[in-house]
């Protein structure tokens, strides 16, 4: 049985700013772009979250919720440097580290000799070391499989950890609400509820064929997760190839203005997600996806060197006009393809 730890730093960017400027600690604080430039929030500290301020929220909305919010533009080089320090701490315990972003990673400590092989104690030691050496807090989840480790890391935030032992997996899953499973958003959760599916226990007695019919490939993933199946390995050399966001609509849309408004919202979330893995926003391509009311879908991409909202809007409108054919649209998505690391290094060499 594997021993997987998911480590998630607590409001990482904001925590670094509070560490470096203690006067910021007890006031609502967010990192993001300015409201007059249609900026978006990257992260917020816990005092700001009490006012409803969240990541991927428009800065203007955040300031309406919390007029006395302190807004900082962020220091990406500092965040990247700190992330490297955190990864070095991880490497003291295992070489099997899979970074998900600057502030989040999976660790496989199955064969680690540290702490007499106790994943719980390794997680405690890692969190304590991060606090002692970097003056930052981290939360952790410990479980035999990846997705449960990620779920567990959310259960005792901030500055805590939660353990799901192999013996506890089945009971934990039976009671787990489906919206807690990564990949189950609000619309999917509602569609599941309409079928009487609220927890993993409900899915276990539901026909796999019906899940596949209703949810496609994700139906199988959902069924497997509810059975406690997640065979994904920790991939230390894994290079993220793309970043995307999409939204399944409760009701189909039929006019471009509705689609344009949705893309404006999705773009803000895409920008936040991309900054976590590629702070300079350099990319290889960006694209749009539309899924129609007959469940057919289309994707169009455009070679572009940097995330660009106007280009995405133009591409989306072209896709809408050329491929919709009067059909309703039930899903809108945006995505970027990242530069191959070898190509990116060559560009730096050629032009640096």
Curated annotation (Swiss-Prot):
GO biological process: DNA-templated DNA replication; error-prone translesion synthesis; SOS response
GO cellular component labels: cytosol
Cofactor note: Binds 2 magnesium ions per subunit.
Swiss-Prot/TrEMBL site (Substrate discrimination) positions: 13
Catalytic activities: DNA(n) + a 2'-deoxyribonucleoside 5'-triphosphate = DNA(n+1) + diphosphate
Active site per database record: 104
EC number: 2.7.7.7
Cellular localization per UniProt: Cytoplasm
Listed Gene3D superfamilies: 3.30.70.270, 3.40.1170.60, 5' to 3' exonuclease, C-terminal subdomain, DNA polymerase, Y-family, little finger domain
UniProt domain UmuC: residue ranges: 4-185
EC category: transferase
UniProt cofactor(s): Mg(2+)
Record-listed Mg(2+) binding positions: 8, 103
Keywords: Cytoplasm, DNA damage, DNA repair, DNA replication, DNA-binding, DNA-directed DNA polymerase, Magnesium, Metal-binding, Mutator protein, Nucleotidyltransferase, Transferase
Entry's Gene Ontology molecular function annotations: damaged DNA binding; DNA-directed DNA polymerase activity; magnesium ion binding
Assigned protein family: Belongs to the DNA polymerase type-Y family.
Oligomer and partners: Monomer.
Described purpose of this protein according to its UniProt entry: Poorly processive, error-prone DNA polymerase involved in untargeted mutagenesis. Copies undamaged DNA at stalled replication forks, which arise in vivo from mismatched or misaligned primer ends. These misaligned primers can be extended by PolIV. Exhibits no 3'-5' exonuclease (proofreading) activity. May be involved in translesional synthesis, in conjunction with the beta clamp from PolIII.
Listed NCBIfam families: PRK02406.1
Protein name: DNA polymerase IV
Organism: Pectobacterium atrosepticum (strain SCRI 1043 / ATCC BAA-672) (Erwinia carotovora subsp. atroseptica)
């Amino acid at each position: 049985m594997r021993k997987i730890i998911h480590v998630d730093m607590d409001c990482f960017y904001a925590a670094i700013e509070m560490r470096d400027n203690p006067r910021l600690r007890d006031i609502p604080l967010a990192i993001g772009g300015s409201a007059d430039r249609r900026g978006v929030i990257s992260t917020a500290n816990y005092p700001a979250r009490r006012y409803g301020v969240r990541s991927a929220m428009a800065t203007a909305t955040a300031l309406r919720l919390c007029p006395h919010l302190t807004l900082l533009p962020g220091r990406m080089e500092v965040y990247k440097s700190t992330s490297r320090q955190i990864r070095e701490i991880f490497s003291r315990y295992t070489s099997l580290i899979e970074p998900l972003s600057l502030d989040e990673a999976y660790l496989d400590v199955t064969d680690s000799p540290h702490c007499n092989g106790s994943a719980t104690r390794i997680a405690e030691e890692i969190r304590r070391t991060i606090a002692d050496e970097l003056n930052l807090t981290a939360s952790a989840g410990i479980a035999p499989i990846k997705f449960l480790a990620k779920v567990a890391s959310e259960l005792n935030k901030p500055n805590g950890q939660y353990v799901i032992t192999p013996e506890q997996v089945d009971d934990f899953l039976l009671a787990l609400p489906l919206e807690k499973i990564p990949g189950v958003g609000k619309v999917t959760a509602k569609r599941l509820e309409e079928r009487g599916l609220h927890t993993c226990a409900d899915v276990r007695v539901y026909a796999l064929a019906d899940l596949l019919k209703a949810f496609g490939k994700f139906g199988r993933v959902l069924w497997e997760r509810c059975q406690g199946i997640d065979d994904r390995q920790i991939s230390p050399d894994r290079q993220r190839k793309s970043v995307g966001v999409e939204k399944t609509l409760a009701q189909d849309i039929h006019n471009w203005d509705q689609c344009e408004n949705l893309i404006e919202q999705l773009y803000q979330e895409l920008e936040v997600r991309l900054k976590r893995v590629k702070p300079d926003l350099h990319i290889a391509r960006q694209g749009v996806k539309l899924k129609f009311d007959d469940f057919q879908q289309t994707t169009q991409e455009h070679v572009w060197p940097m995330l660009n909202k106007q280009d995405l809007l133009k591409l989306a409108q072209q896709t809408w006009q050329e491929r919709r054919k009067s059909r309703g649209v039930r899903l809108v998505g945006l995505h970027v393809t990242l530069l191959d690391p070898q190509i990116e290094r060559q560009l730096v060499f050629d032009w640096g």
